[in-house]
A protein has these predicted regions:
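Glycan-recognition and catalytic cores of secretory/periplasmic carbohydrate-active enzymes
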Residues: 1-326
């Protein structure tokens, strides 16, 4: 009955709807969110385990996603309730509480989940303090636990004072997801740059090319992937650093596959002027409808980030359309 696994299932349903347009997803999620609104007052997000309240931003994000489709007012009421039961990320990020300055204070993946919550909530609160909270947090983290990959030292709890500490694979893919949702909500290019940093530095090296194995923890500038003792908070019989399926803890095997597909889904965005915007660069093709129903195919050809040029090709389905502005 834990709320947290249901949040994962809702993310899967969202992906299914985006790929197929299956209206059963909308009906199911609407019914589930009515159930949640009725039951959360007595059994809040943290009733069964702490995961739900730390990761409530995922729940909130999905509620607002459905609201943007159906416009049903009860979803806003539910969003207010979920936010009130979720870990208070905005005060934490602004330094009102000391978790970001305290050794072993936060589970590394919970921080990746929670990083987006203030920006998701900002869509409702319109409070600049919420919008800016992750920026304040990252400025703090860069000088304490931050790594060049755009992530942080956490194996599995936050670690200060040593850049060779581990960083969990789940942190990478969940931080990418958070950044992608933050870009959609805010349009802030800082988070697009941050997404590229994680996607092109942390993710490629932490799984095999065939995706039949992964590390649990990655270390910056590590010189060996070996089964031996390292000063991790949770060493898991010293298997965290090698490549495999069940080494470390199995969660990363379940989670690693969302990294690249969701990254590809977030290469192109709709813009306010009814056009399209490429916030993140990668070889890609997008079939889009813009302006007054104009159909177009956009292609990015690039070797970025190893090359500094991106060639964008625009093809229109109707030959009468001859103009495009950049």
């Amino acid at each position: 009955e834990d709320w947290w696994p249901k949040m994962v299932a809702l993310k899967v349903l969202k992906q299914h709807y985006m790929a197929t347009g299956d209206e059963r997803v909308i009906k199911l999620m609407t019914s589930y969110f009515r159930y949640q609104l009725a039951n959360l007052p007595e059994k809040p997000l943290g009733h069964w385990t702490f995961w739900g309240e730390w990761r409530g931003g995922d729940n909130l994000d999905l509620v607002y996603w459905l609201y943007n489709i159906t416009g049903e007012d009860f979803l806003l009421e539910l969003g207010d309730l979920i936010h009130s039961q979720t870990t208070a990320w905005t005060p934490m990020f602004h330094g009102d509480t000391k978790e970001l300055q305290t050794q072993n204070s936060i589970h590394c993946v919970n921080l990746a989940h929670g990083f987006k919550e203030p920006v998701i909530w900002w869509q409702r609160s319109h409070d600049e303090k919420d919008l800016n909270a992750p920026k304040v947090a990252w400025e703090t983290m860069k000088h304490t636990i931050g790594l060049p990959t755009g992530l942080w030292a956490g194996d599995e709890l936050l670690r200060f004072g040593d850049p060779t500490r581990g960083s969990e694979l789940c942190t990478a893919v969940e931080m990418m997801y958070s950044l992608e949702e933050m870009i959609q909500a805010s349009g802030d290019m800082q988070w697009a740059d941050h997404l590229e940093r994680v996607a092109y530095n942390a993710l490629p090296t932490q799984a095999t090319d065939s995706y039949d194995g992964r590390q649990y923890y990655q270390q910056t500038n590590q010189i060996a992937c070996s089964r031996e003792w390292r000063p991790f908070v949770t060493p898991h019989t010293d298997t965290d650093n090698v490549f495999g399926i069940l080494n470390g803890y199995p969660c990363c095997t379940c989670n690693m596959h969302q990294g690249w597909p969701k990254f590809v889904q977030n290469l192109w965005y709709a813009s306010k002027d009814h056009g399209a915007a490429a916030f993140v660069y990668a070889p890609s093709t997008a079939h889009i409808t813009v302006a007054d129903g104009v159909e177009a195919v956009l292609r990015q050809e690039t070797g970025y980030p190893f090359e500094e040029t991106v060639m964008v090709t625009v093809d229109f389905a109707h030959k009468k359309v001859r103009k495009a502005s950049f």
